[in-house]
Amino acid sequence: MLDQNEPTLTRRRLLQMGLAAGTAGALNLLGGSAADAATVKTPAAKPKATADSVIVIWLPGGVAQTDTWDPKKFTPYVQGMKGGDILGTCPSIPTSADGIRLGAGLENIASVMDKGTILRSLTNKTKFGAIHLKAQYYMMTGYLFPAGVEAPSMGAVVSRTLGRRDPNIPAYIDIGRDINTSNEEFLFINEFMGPGFYGIKHAPFMIPEPAQGLPTLKAVAGMDMTRLDRRQHYLEAITGLSAPALQTAHPVKDYVKVMEDARAMMDSPVKRAFLFAEEEKPETLKAYDVGHRFGFGCLLARRLVESGARFIQVEYQYEPFGGFDMHADGQSRMKAMKAQIDRPVAQLIRDLDQRGLLERTLVIVMSEFGRTIANQPAAGTEAFGFAERSTGSDLVIQNEKMYGFHGHFSSGNCMLFFGGGFKKGFVYGKTADAHPLLPIENPVRLEDVHATIYKALGIPADTNYVTEQRPFYVTNNGKGVPIDALLA
């Protein structure tokens, strides 16, 4: 309501009132108030950090583990063979680590396995463990969807708990995800890869197309930096006024801080990280260039770590029934997908190691689940008609499109870890050599994996922040236990 005793309603005052009202409305829609702002509680003793930075190589869609990180006996295609006879659709190859083998087509990653650890027994026995988006949410947050509270992703946890390594670089950066979309699935992904209830300050800084650099670090054409600074001062003046609703509204202050940080980046050395086309050697560019933005995303991640980034997530864009989401023709499609990731991931590890950065940088390769011979194909494909979530053992493989691992399998997932205090040339966990390929040694819970990652970063597994008058832990209910066997 306007104050009738105020003789002049200035433009500045009008903007102030509108911003304050909008903030109050947003808080009501979120079901909270400024007083609900999360506050930290004292966790257990802080472990000694062995990593300063994290790079997550995110391969959504469900990577077939038996053709990649946990190869089984190669069973060549024969028309009429039974599904239960298929354990692997490619030969295995030796690696630089004694006794460790990978699926053929990963020769470059195989050459750096003496620097990494493979976890082969990650299990997900939750009700929705084999549903893409819910499994992705679980992998990234450690909580089931819906969690009652919008859970923060790992990147947001690291951002809030550790903050920035360099004041000019956001603590949480995402490379390669499409953000200009109206697709409901992708919009959901953008939500759960975000800050959750931590707020906009801990949202990822998005870089959709690494090869195009970051146009937002450049002033709008025709606008000099003086004019841009003047606009920034106007914004600060608006938000610095005395309306109580505005002064106590954390979301508004956080949005303003994000804009201030973006302006600061325009004058910072971090811009050089995007100049890889001009600064890198031709042979380096060739190693990362696989005809997909994922490759240059790995290169940009390395350059950002060199510049002082804290947490970077490089994504191979999720595409239902595309990419790693294979419901038919799995053998040939998997071969093509391995070619997309093999060189860039291996080159990233080599570059970090040669520059002395791998020791304090943790690189994680992960997907939401693995694959099994059971078939869940897309309607309209040649393979359509297989019993959903069947064991697949009695399926008759009638053509090559049916030859491959097409079913969602959450009970035997794999992860890779390089650097950051993890062991080198090491395998943890073992799965059976016969269907259904379940873990038979050292089955692992996701909350324990998260606890191990956080321990490497010096974050206790029971770190928590209060929201809605209750603690919310960085591992599921604070029950994560670090797997010390993975750590050097």
Go through each PLM region and give its residues.
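Ligand-binding pockets and gating/stacking loops
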Residues: 1-488
